[in-house]
Amino acid sequence: ILMWDIYNEPGQFGTGDKAFKLLQYTWDWAYEIRPSQPLTACLDGAIGKEILNLNGENSDVITFHTYEAEKLEPTIERLKEFGRPLLCTEYMAREFGTTFEFSLPIFKKENVGCYNWGFVAGKSQTHFGWSTILELQEKKKKGEFINEGDELPEPDEWFHDVYRIDGSPFKESEIKFIKELLGS
């Protein structure tokens, strides 16, 4: 176990600071058992000033989510102020510019850890963008584009994942880039 992310995106979905009390309890419970691994709850990805402050004060490692390319470097600069290790736990969104080619050199330069949320296109369907599934389901309801029982077609631009279910890469150029960056 690398670390415990005790509460993903507190304050999201309109709960804002209403989630603050539950987050306080969550931090109390986590510190009561105090595992040997670091504790964290994301800062960028959480919503509400009190929530952000609480997570910043209590996280051993500062974790964050940044999907928009133009926000990545400013977010890293802002979070460096905590003086703790940084780990980006959600970032890969090709349609928003946070591709491997864009993001990984920044993480490397800034000494920020990261991991890719999706790997193989499968049951979770994270190769589809946030709006793709809803759009396709609407077309399906109208009898357009897709029939009951048909597989959803592969999107032109994937969101998270790297490999197809058969093991072939979505973009061979990404695999080559990652190998070159890692020196393998």
Predicted segments, located by residue:
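Substrate-binding clefts and catalytic carboxylate motifs of secreted carbohydrate-active enzymes
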Residues: 2, 11-184
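Carbohydrate-associated surface elements
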Residues: 7
